[in-house]
Amino acid sequence: MIDFGIDQFTLTLYVDEDEYLAYDCNYFQLVLRRFSNELYLEEIFGKPVLLPHGDGWYNCIYDFGFDNRHLYFKYNDEILSNQMSIVFHAETLREFLRSYRNKIDSSITVFRLLKKLSTLGKVRLSRLDIAIDFIDEGVSVDDLAKRINDYNVIVTNSRRSVISPEDVNQIGSGGKVETLYINRRTSASFLRIYDKKKEVLQKDSSFLKTAMECENWTRIELELKKYGSVAKLNL
């Protein structure tokens, strides 16, 4: 089986300066309520928790998630030019879609979720993670690494320049490659190819049943971020 989907995303929500002047210090709480109400977040996750710290860019962070599964609403009430940020982590996005389908609307998709978020104001996708899963398709990370090393598979960047095998980070154990990293995480695009079955079996995950039932599972994850990688939404 080959499956394609959106794994997680980060959305930048721009400050409406006219509305900010009208509501002043209450503006961000107003937007937070709109965000929560639009997605029925309190019905699904409960009330958000204000974290006791910021992250260097935003000084106020609300988390609708739980444990290591996060859904953040971030803003900086001292630097308006930082705008606001909505972050759906992968596990939380899956849990949100599942709960929303059960409780609110069975037809919700990631695209419809993004369309609902676009009603909050001017928005831009600042990060989008795309996942392609090869389950029982016989796709091996170790085999792919060997083919890259032998130049049977050529890897190129956005400028179509060839990326040499030496610049592809290969990680594994027992003489077997289990993860490939292409480009840097800080770059506008980043590619990770890894043994998803092994990862799921090593930690708590909603994918545990799938991992236990399949023979092999390789995932390709593409991170797109920064200015030119992900465009403004026009939904």
Show the residue positions of the predicted features.
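Structured, helix-rich domain cores that form ligand/interaction pockets
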Residues: 1-235
